[in-house]
Amino acid sequence: MPRLKTRREKRLRRHKRIRKKVFGTPERPRLCVYRSLNHFYAQIIDDTIGHTLVSASTLDPEFEKITGKRGGKSIKDAEVVAEIIARRALEKGIKKVVFDRGGFKYHGKIKAFADKCREMGLEF
């Protein structure tokens, strides 16, 4: 009898499938997102050398200055993280990225994050 798959297992399978196709280069690094139960994380990675170029999260001190709270799990908090990472990327001269949604469905916080990044000037 087949075992029921948990949400986490399904997400990890989607993530593996996406990672086979998505690869960050120096010209077009990978914008990777992770959504935990209480926080939202994003980083821009150059996969050729395996370095994180830019990162932001709801634990970032700049996030705390903007929102007045440490941590957050709402859609608005994901948009604030998008503003922070987009600004930092543009300061480093990164305009084009490949979006890696980390196996999460393109919905809710992930969609709001991506839309805000595009609005701030990042090209996917």
UniProtKB/Swiss-Prot annotation:
The keyword Ribonucleoprotein applies. One of its GO terms (biological process) is translation. One of its GO terms (molecular function) is structural constituent of ribosome. The keyword Ribonucleoprotein applies. It holds the Pfam family Ribosomal_L18p. GO terms for cellular component: cytosolic large ribosomal subunit. Keywords: Ribonucleoprotein, Ribosomal protein, RNA-binding, rRNA-binding. Belongs to the universal ribosomal protein uL18 family. This is one of the proteins that bind and probably mediate the attachment of the 5S RNA into the large ribosomal subunit, where it forms part of the central protuberance. NCBIfam families: L18_bact. Part of the 50S ribosomal subunit; part of the 5S rRNA/L5/L18/L25 subcomplex. Contacts the 5S and 23S rRNAs. PANTHER family: 39S RIBOSOMAL PROTEIN L18, MITOCHONDRIAL, LARGE RIBOSOMAL SUBUNIT PROTEIN UL18M. This is Large ribosomal subunit protein uL18. The gene is rplR.
